Amino acid sequence: ELQVDYIDYLLLHGVGMGGMEEIEGRFMNNGILDHLLEERQKGRIRNLGFSFHGDVKIFDYLLSLHDAGKYTWDFVQIQLNYVDWRHAQEEHARNINAEYLYGELAKRNIPSVIMEPLLGGRLANVHAHIAAILKQRRPDLSIASWAFRFAGTHPMVLSVLSGMPYME
């Protein structure tokens, strides 16, 4: 029992990693997604979305259902940072370029929630020559702040999640 009248944002987590069978088994064939949509219709869920990880066919399929009006999404959580914008597959073969993911959502006016803006902390600790270029331009800014600003400056970004255990 949550003991609240409504949920502001409900997220289906980890969508896309296990293929079509998993998405259908976890959310569709068992009626869970239909139930969540009913709860949204009743006002008990204000915003329904999913976090995307993995197979772009699943992402495109869920957006096609949105386009058809069957399952509409209020937001989608995606991995977006200045490396993954155009070079996601260089990091991991299953990753999809954030430019594509964000662009498809923006075309549909679906806000994005951003995960991994620092790419697991690696963008806060860049190579010295890159850090020097950034510091030369704006010495007052931290290296991590460049990554956060990149992630947050796109107009359809709802929120940028830090995922950091320490402020440093």
Task: Please name every model-derived segment.
Residues L12-E168:
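Beta/alpha (TIM)-barrel catalytic core signal, keyed to glycine-rich beta->alpha loops juxtaposed to Asp/Glu
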Residues E1-M17:
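Active-site gating/metal-coordination segments in enzymes
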